[in-house]
Amino acid sequence: MKLKVILNLLKPCILHTIEEIIDYMDVCMHAEVRSVLNAETSPVSALRLHSTLGRDIRNKFSLWNHNNVACRKFHKENNELYHPDSVSQYIINELVKRIRMQNGLDVKPFELTQIYQTTGNYVAIA
């Protein structure tokens, strides 16, 4: 299934916590994207979503801005170096958990690390 425009990218949305971003996404997400997150949990799906939904999340919520308040809080709380890819992947994982729980399904978040461990390669993802 090819995903179309996922978020309205014309207006960036600045929120102050990652939880606010997840809540916003949960409310505003298209039904098509919700069904994909509900159904697919393979590493290949994770990579595809990272390149589509993840990109849109990074752009919509200005995650590439290193002064982004939500990202700075997230990385400080998790003792991680800042990278927009890790924040968008965390958001996708949390959305998968939330949507699958709402539908009474097993909670199995996407894990890009599975792809890296399987192939032994690190892939540059924009």
Segments predicted by a language model, with ranges:
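Short intrinsically disordered terminal tails
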Residues: 1, 123-126
